[in-house]
Amino acid sequence: MNTALAQQIANEGGVEAWMIAQQHKSLLRFLTCGSVDDGKSTLIGRLLHDTRQIYEDQLSSLHNDSKRHGTQGEKLDLALLVDGLQAEREQGITIDVAYRYFSTEKRKFIIADTPGHEQYTRNMATGASTCELAILLIDARKGVLDQTRRHSFISTLLGIKHLVVAINKMDLVDYSEETFTRIREDYLTFAGQLPGNLDIRFVPLSALEGDNVASQSESMPWYSGPTLLEVLETVEIQRVVDAQPMRFPVQYVNRPNLDFRGYAGTLASGRVEVGQRVKVLPSGVESNVARIVTFDGDREEAFAGEAITLVLTDEIDISRGDLLLAADEALPAVQSASVDVVWMAEQPLSPGQSYDIKIAGKKTRARVDGIHYQVDINNLTQREVENLPLNGIGLVDLTFDEPLVLDRYQQNPVTGGLIFIDRLSNVTVGAGMVHEPVSQATAAPSEFSAFELELNALVRRHFPHWGARDLLGDK
């Protein structure tokens, strides 16, 4: 057993007491991102090493792996703790998203180590989608690069409000305060272009040497701020969903016998209590909450993020994908929306194409009406394009086959986040964040049906010699 873990269990008074203490710790999900070879995997390895989360057999294996694949000479290559794929170890880069778990006396953590290469943008977006904080690594020798800007933009696009700019490899610039100050000013100048009210913090460190990672550095007396671990342990996460209105997407209708009918799911935002009047969308039927059933028994109220089963006073028609919200809230269903899209497939996203989409348990079909622009994620400029390529990010107009209840992604990631699914292969080909739902009054009517538009796109793609015109060419 890990000696540090054994000591923690002893201090808590046994395994059972230790497990109870773990359950009551807050959880922080964060990701590390930055340019290639900025030291992301090394930083995570250092956090695991310095918080004594590595077992003795892992440490022994790390010594052997460092001799075979290491890039740090005689020193331990801590990056190998995270780079698990054979291709990653041989190339010395991160390809896939690697998740690691550790805890301290104050908090539990889930780390997503995301790739820095531009061709793995889709992997980074996947890792960022569930995180609350992003650590942006910058090589002190190189300063703010295009990839730094790209990762910052993707993080904020996916709703991350807390950014920790870790200026790494300070040991290679002689722990220069001037270098730290210059990079800090450069990043703040760029950050003015990022959307939202962001919490940005700066920490100078050396992941290889351990300076300012888990303990204060003696080599940088000019820095009096917290270490990276102290920032992670003390940052107060802004949970946007707590302040938002109630949203309860139904994931499953639970009917184990004739006497019980409940609607299971995770409360996406707000709170719900017994006796509350609720409305079911898109039908608009109303009822009252009779019971809130959980694994630990009935509750009088529940809050955002909790998995619950709601029992209503009336027997009404509710199925998977329906949405429950407060009865006095007017939230219209829409059939069109502008959506920020991260495209993840080799086949580009083009106007006229149709895809299956899933959003908050609901599955339907959507047609691409047009592409407003693609974002150049290296300098955040916008340019007109005919299609959205692999790893491209852009603003797209969608029309759905049926009315949907949507929120803006920045307000509610559950009811504002969707995925695109290829209808033939059933593969996820893109991720979308609702930029703005379009009400029926403002949606432009189409003179063509969804079938006609899809057939037109099919003919133009496979039979270009027929010379068929683009029915959406005016968009």
Curated annotation (Swiss-Prot):
One Pfam family cited in the UniProt record for this chain: GTP_EFTU
UniProt region (G4), positions on chain: 168-171
GO biological process: one example: sulfate assimilation
Any one GO molecular-function label of the UniProt entry: GTP binding
Residues covered by region (G3): 113-116
Record domain tr-type G: where: 25-239
Record-listed E.C. numbers: 2.7.7.4
Residues covered by region (G1): 34-41
Annotated family: Belongs to the TRAFAC class translation factor GTPase superfamily. Classic translation factor GTPase family. CysN/NodQ subfamily.
NCBIfam families xref list: CysN, PRK05124.1, small_GTP
Subunit structure: Heterodimer composed of CysD, the smaller subunit, and CysN.
Designated name of the protein: Sulfate adenylyltransferase subunit 1
Taxonomic source organism: Escherichia coli O1:K1 / APEC
